């Protein structure tokens, strides 16, 4: 699958084939791809926590209510950010930090890398839901400087996800100024 095909066909998967297991090597390759994501000032503040404990996956819904399907996933990857490594204006002003953006970019890379290997994923938020983040920190014994950003369920899809229609909307593209949604006319070079 080429990059554009993967980008345009990737979908959230919530039904997993419980008879198939993902190798640790495949998980490492997927996380390696995520670690090649760009970050502000190349700080690379992300950390990845892989959890395949059945009890945790089954009970995750008590921490983040929209993860009931995690019980059938092969694993979850908690994408975390290290606040001590994030680029920010100052150590005192975390409101101006790029940690969420850096973790979001890495999460998208992780989702696409998994899809390219025939795996399904579903991004489930942890940030900015403070209660979810606090519960994850407690249950997983995360250090004070580690913030859980995303919960990503992963496994082999039990079915082919339906492709939604109408995602591409040219009227959402503005050329040169907000009011202009007409694409510039391309002319052949003379």
Regions found by a protein language model. Name each.
Residues 1-190:
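Acidic, surface-exposed loops and disordered segments
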């Amino acid at each position: 699958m080429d990059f554009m095909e993967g980008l345009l066909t990737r979908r959230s998967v919530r039904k997993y084939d419980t008879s198939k297991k993902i190798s640790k090597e495949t998980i490492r390759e997927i996380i390696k791809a995520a670690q090649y994501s760009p970050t502000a000032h190349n700080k690379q503040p992300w950390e990845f926590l892989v959890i395949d404990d059945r009890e945790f996956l089954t009970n995750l819904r008590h921490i983040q209510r929209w993860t009931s399907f995690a019980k059938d996933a092969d694993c979850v990857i908690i994408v975390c950010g290290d606040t001590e490594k994030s680029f920010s204006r100052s150590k005192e002003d975390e409101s101006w930090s790029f940690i969420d953006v850096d973790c979001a970019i890495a999460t998208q890379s992780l989702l696409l890398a998994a899809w390219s290997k025939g795996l399904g994923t579903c991004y489930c938020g942890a940030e900015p839901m403070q209660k979810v983040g606090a519960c994850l920190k407690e249950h997983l014994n995360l250090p004070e400087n580690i913030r859980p950003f995303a919960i990503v369920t992963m496994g082999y899809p039990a079915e082919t996800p339906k492709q939604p229609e109408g995602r591409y909307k040219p009227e959402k593209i503005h050329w040169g100024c907000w009011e202009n949604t007409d694409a510039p006319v391309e002319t052949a070079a003379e």
